[in-house]
């Protein structure tokens, strides 16, 4: 069966839901899907139920559904790909890759609870991984009858956003009830439409880096019987046409191959554009030749490196960081794009130790090469938790 072609008629925006566990991220995602499918019916606005969205991250990862917990929908203005980032601490790694894919995010805060630990953690992570815009869905608003409480929660969330470098004063805060909207309640359906209007208006059309050389970090790799190996990820920049030659850079020696097919939301494309989640079919490449953490690039545009100077912020104990200082030769993991690589930190002369809460210049020696450019962001992690975040300032070798 020939696949339907993906039509590009509206601006495409990647968004997602973030926030504390059980505050209703997935319910709200399902509600957006339902309300839009009823009020703006189209080929794109197909209702996705809660269970399908909720089970996406784990179960379907090994199937051939490209784009794991992404759903697509459209407003009158735009086409959206929406990723539902699960809320548990052990999903933080997914959150880092998921959040890195967002042009903006809906921070879901239950009006019944207010901001909680993971609310703060997700806002901090959103800032670190460069989610440029947030807006707030004050969820479960049907369960709070006291206007003062709603106002207090709103103030608290605005303050939290301001403290983390977002524009807390001007961020839209929309009162919603994902559950009631999902049940078909007219009033709360209107609230979901109001939320989507706020998303349309407060998250600017992303400036896509289409003119730069193509780069896509690999998130997943699988085999499609009879066709070959597919790598999936979000194109960070550039445009890639079918039958183009590419290089796969990082972790292993650089290899050349040809992209023989491109698909997105199970539809065939002639080209992959910056900002799109897609799967690339690679000619003559075996499943074991490529892995998560490598990047697919225009030949000659990016090189692998192991040693760099970076600027990093080390999280304080209160932010969930380390409780004690570290010294030269500290060996954490450096999380670049989609993978962790161990690296050895050397502190600048005259700096004996680094305290939680410090901002510091470091030299890092990675045990495996990573496709790297100046300005590339990374997280510093240890034992599965983020203890710092930084940027590559200068490549040394």
From Swiss-Prot:
PROSITE patterns: G_TR_1 (PS00301), G_TR_2 (PS51722). It catalyses: GTP + H2O = GDP + phosphate + H(+). Residues 139-142 are annotated as: G4. Keywords: Cytoplasm, Elongation factor, GTP-binding, Hydrolase, Magnesium, Metal-binding, Nucleotide-binding, Protein biosynthesis. Its EC number is 3.6.5.3. Residues 84-87 are annotated as: G3. The keyword GTP-binding applies. One of its GO terms (cellular component) is cytosol. It is found in: Cytoplasm. It is an enzyme of class 3 (hydrolase). One of its GO terms (molecular function) is translation elongation factor activity. Residues 19-26 are annotated as: G1. Residues 10-207 form the tr-type G domain. Residues 63-67 are annotated as: G2. Residues 177-179 are annotated as: G5. Pfam families: GTP_EFTU, GTP_EFTU_D2, GTP_EFTU_D3. The keyword Nucleotide-binding applies. Mg(2+) binds at residue 26. GTP binds at residues 19-26, 84-88, 139-142. HAMAP family: EF_Tu_B. GTP hydrolase that promotes the GTP-dependent binding of aminoacyl-tRNA to the A-site of ribosomes during protein biosynthesis. Monomer. Belongs to the TRAFAC class translation factor GTPase superfamily. Classic translation factor GTPase family. EF-Tu/EF-1A subfamily. This is Elongation factor Tu.
